[in-house]
Amino acid sequence: MSLFSLLFALFSCQAQDKGFESLPVEAFKRAIADTTVVRLDVRTAEEFAEGHIEKAINIDVLKSDFEQEATSILPKDMVIAVNCRSGKRSKKAAGILVKNGYKVIELDSGYNGWVKEGN
């Protein structure tokens, strides 16, 4: 088995263990085109105001009441598509949401990657 194959297999297992899928920009874009997907931006209000994915809800994952606010607003019968600036905070938020019974996808490269690819 090549090193690349081994790393790919390890990464795939880790993603499954987290309970959510991290998607590249194009796959995320296709996923959020579905009207049954809720778009969640977990950056600060200031970052969100500078630009965001259309129709996204903003709940700052760094706020102490993120979990309470998210679970009171987000529907559990829909997929939650999470993004942040670069992918770190969205992974944290995705983990919290999965723990609370949500089905989650996450934009691996964040809003920066989204913009970089011309969106």
Q: How should these model regions be labeled?
A:
Residues F4-L7, F11-A31, V37, E46-V79, ...:
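Rhodanese-like catalytic fold shared by cysteine-dependent sulfurtransferases
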Residues R39-D41:
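Structural scaffold elements adjacent to functional motifs in cytosolic proteins
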Residues N83:
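Short, surface-exposed ligand- or partner-binding patches at beta-edge/loop junctions that are enriched
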